[in-house]
């Protein structure tokens, strides 16, 4: 649906060349809500603005429905852009226009008949819950209401793609939650593909199906939201995950490590969905006659799927511990031995 192929974007400032996007490859499937997260200056805004050619790539291709927008002539490009809606961090509403006229603007630009405009705008204002604000002006609205109007305007031309540029970063937590709920509703009821950028991992957790992490113009990690949260690989990704889910060693585990008992090993296992840690622990007891103690367990929820980390220790003679370690190395749950602040493969 949306595809970036080896996209690079450079800017020139005096004698300096700044690379905002560096050989980016990204694929967003039809119907997905795909989040891109990164710190300030990571290249997120340039990426999303490249999706509808607000920024033209220096090299590479951006494809929407298999079409490279950069190859289209002016009239064809205008038509293609009607299929791409966009909402902004600071709403970008016309202050001198009423709510009705703001939502109607894209339709007026395409010379849609007045009766059709009224029908569509009325429908959209009802959808975003602001039917009673049609004659109001933006200055009379709250931040959340302004963003709802921005969303209605972005949907006016019945797009298949919605681009969200930090759509909730100017909003308070409760309003953010309501806007995210509305975006999820749009995705489900209108089957609109959503590409959103944010610096808030809580937004990714709330509604995204997949996520890409950007740093210095590159995608450094990507995958399903569940896989990224449960097993971040890059240090930057781990920072984002840690901002809402602690990943450090629990106090009891640290205390156990400090005791440095020779016949004791400590492991961490990540469990997701239906994965059964109880079978793992039971097999250790039954197969090796080994003493197993759960030191700490945490559970979290990602869009209805639970995942967590369990820390357990094994006590036995060195030969038995060695056999158990070999067993754990081949186990599907891939437990990791905890040594100090490090986790190493079992």
UniProtKB/Swiss-Prot annotation:
Transmembrane segments: none
Membrane topology annotation: Peripheral membrane protein
Reactions this protein catalyses: L-methionine(out) + ATP + H2O = L-methionine(in) + ADP + phosphate + H(+); D-methionine(out) + ATP + H2O = D-methionine(in) + ADP + phosphate + H(+)
Residues binding ATP: 38-45
Localization annotation: Cell membrane
Catalytic activity, EC: 7.4.2.11
InterPro entries: AAA+_ATPase, ABC_transporter-like_ATP-bd, ABC_transporter-like_CS, ACT-like_dom_sf, MetN_ABC, MetN_ABC_transporter-like, NIL_domain, P-loop_NTPase
Start and end residues of each ABC transporter domain: 2-241
Pfam families, per the entry: ABC_tran, NIL
Taxonomy, superkingdom: Bacteria
Gene3D superfamilies according to UniProt: 3.30.70.260, P-loop containing nucleotide triphosphate hydrolases (3.40.50.300)
Principal cellular location given in the protein's record: membrane
UniProt keywords, alphabetically: Amino-acid transport, ATP-binding, Cell membrane, Membrane, Nucleotide-binding, Translocase, Transport
Record GO cellular component, one term: plasma membrane
SMART domains, sorted: AAA, NIL
Assembly with partners or alone: The complex is composed of two ATP-binding proteins (MetN), two transmembrane proteins (MetI) and a solute-binding protein (MetQ).
Function: Part of the ABC transporter complex MetNIQ involved in methionine import. Responsible for energy coupling to the transport system.
Family in the record: Belongs to the ABC transporter superfamily. Methionine importer (TC 3.A.1.24) family.
Name of the protein in its database record: Methionine import ATP-binding protein MetN 1
Organism expressing this protein natively: Shouchella clausii (strain KSM-K16) (Alkalihalobacillus clausii)
